[in-house]
Amino acid sequence: MLTFMASDSEEEVCDERTSLMSAESPTSRSCQDSRPGPEDGENTAQWRSQENEDDCEEDPDHYACSGVPGRPSGLEEELTLKYGAKHVIMLFVPVTLCMIVVVATIKSVRFYTEKNGQLIYTPFTEDTPSVGQRLLNSVLNTLIMISVIVVMTIFLVVLYKYRCYKFIHGWLIMSSLMLLFLFTYIYLGEVFKTYNVAMDYPTLFLAVWNFGAVGMVCIHWKGPLVLQQAYLIVISALMALVFIKYLPEWSAWVILGAISVYDLVAVLCPKGPLRMLVETAQERNEPIFPALIYSSAMVWTVGMAKLDPSSQGALQLPYDPEMEEDSYDSFGEPSYPEAFEAPQPGYPGEEPEEEEERGVKLGLGDFIFYSVLVGKAAATGNGDWSTTLACFIAILIGLCLTLLLLAVFKKALPALPISITFGLIFYFSTDNLVRPFMDTLASHQLYI
């Protein structure tokens, strides 16, 4: 699920935050500059009369200085055009990188294409000549897998509802530890074995320790935004490789179709688990855990930086019921409105604060299942690049359409259904129609 977000915290921009990320959005005119000074007594009456005459002309900065909780529609369209294309590209790049890492690993490392085991969530084997029995086993595996996902999601919602934050943080930290240390060790070992690279165990352990420790700090505490994004991409790729290796072929395709339907229900249904998680977070005015979300802008949570004493005079927008449905982030985090500066006395040489950068958020589960689809196409598509490329393009087209619908409806949308549907259609049509057609043309030495 994804959406645009304005900010992730009700706090103003802090000194430590600006050291981690440079704001790229234009600065707004300060309130002091827009008001007449004490020495402009003769111009005060003229300024007030012009204010009455220019009621029809809407100045975006007037809202920021007066604290009026609203913006003209023209400014909203301008912001959509301004931030839309930029952040669509910023979302396409990590999705593409994650899928490239998975496909490159599948094509080069045989370990992830060898079938020597199954997950405990898919106990039914598909090693049977009967097509009906194989289809039945894949459906049963899918039911078990989706049931586990639903139960764990509801369990997470219950923990969050009863404020078991330490348990949730411990759960996420243990998962990150396993991915960044154990799975990275296995991955590096197989890569070194494939390319015949000699490596002693102390050096390997030291490299894995440094990699994992930096990742834990960046994901669960604080660090540069680019480094945090890189670690989230690596985690998604490692998890996708595990699914590709241990999910049976037919079960993988059925699970991909079922998980897209579940994503649709969980996000849009009023009693969906993710929607309930979002509503609880909005009631408490709290952010969702950043370890579950990829953000194209800084995900700023409480405790990551100290408050600047000079930023205590900010006024927040009042609660708006219509804004509640349109402020969900990619994994259920509320996107809080921007803070408006309260009018304060002007001081010479005072610089206006920079506006916080907007961004797009996408759940890590979307990264994982995008990569699973492309990786399965690369592993089971008889090594044909046309099938892999078709699935890759289909996912990007679906993601682009989802972002387009996001801009139209201005509400949170699930990111899996359109992309996964296009990917499945492109995979089976290319593998069963396009590839045989190309093979026939090549056998007759005909080129188009």
Curated annotation (Swiss-Prot):
Biological-process GO terms, alphabetical: amyloid precursor protein catabolic process; amyloid-beta formation; amyloid-beta metabolic process; apoptotic signaling pathway; brain morphogenesis; calcium ion homeostasis; calcium ion transport; cardiac muscle contraction
Motif PAL in this chain: 414-416
Residue ranges, Lumenal side: 107-138, 188-200, 245-249, 380-388
InterPro entries named in the record: Pept_A22A_PS2 (IPR001493), Peptidase_A22A (IPR001108), Preselin/SPP (IPR006639), Presenilin_C (IPR042524)
First-tier enzyme category under EC: hydrolase
Disulfide bonds: none
Post-translational modification Phosphoserine, affected residues: S22, S25, S30
Subcellular location: Endoplasmic reticulum membrane; Golgi apparatus membrane
Region Disordered, residue ranges: 1-62
Membrane-spanning parts: 88-106, 139-159, 167-187, 201-221, 224-244, 250-270, 359-379, 389-409
Bias kind Polar residues: ranges: 19-33
Location (main, coarse): endoplasmic reticulum
Domain notes per entry: The PAL motif is required for normal active site conformation.
Function of the protein: Probable catalytic subunit of the gamma-secretase complex, an endoprotease complex that catalyzes the intramembrane cleavage of integral membrane proteins such as Notch receptors and APP (amyloid-beta precursor protein). Requires the other members of the gamma-secretase complex to have a protease activity. May play a role in intracellular signaling and gene expression or in linking chromatin to the nuclear membrane. May function in the cytoplasmic partitioning of proteins.
Name under which the protein is recorded: Presenilin-2
Protein source organism: Rattus norvegicus (Rat)
Gene name of the encoded protein: Psen2
